[in-house]
Amino acid sequence: GFEFGFEGKGSLLVCLTRQALEKERREIRLFEEFKIPASMVNRDEALGLEPALLPSIMGGVYYPRDGRIDPRRFVVGLAEKASGLGAQLHTKTEAIGFESNRGRVTKVRTTRGELTANQIILASGSWSPQVARALKLRVPIQPAKGYSVTVENPPVTPRLPLLFSEARVVINPLGHALRIAGTLELAGMDFSFNPRRVAAMQNASAEYLPGLAEAKVIEIWRGL
């Protein structure tokens, strides 16, 4: 194994209003149906689980089996493990075409030469439909753009990963930093950056956790 910051303390969905709390109460029945542990918590119980929250919250839902990781450490760790087991990683290499023989793909043409393999897996995420067109295949994937903002040394550091119901934002503690993630834009392969989305996420989060609107931003990310 390898260390990637895993903590399995659960997660807490937080509501500011009674309307949101009632909506989550109705949805929790689905979790019960699939035997996924989840429990409604009132304001005092939520603050007991996560003292960093503002006392103006109404309550929420606690998911005891949830956990958190540091995504970068996880991906880097996987790459290092794979390399140690003999895998070859071709970074900064773009697939630009294929060669096939009798209905089987035998080679991948890349910006750094050809790669030959017995089996080829297409796992290009949002780019899969574009790559698959070269094979006359239709892959039903729709790109969805999301954003994250990482702030340094926030005024408070939550114990748990948090989900903010009304703001539709997720909070992941990362040591001396805090990552705020959310939004979903269905805009095709659009890599443009919308600063209003980022500001809205940060400002909305400040209604649940103190001081986030003024916290120092060290990274803004968007991806498909």
Where are these regions (language model features)?
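Helical element adjacent to the flavin cofactor pocket in flavoenzyme catalytic cores
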Residues: 22-34, 53-119
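Alpha-helix N-cap/helix-start capping motif
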Residues: 18, 43-44, 72, 93, ...
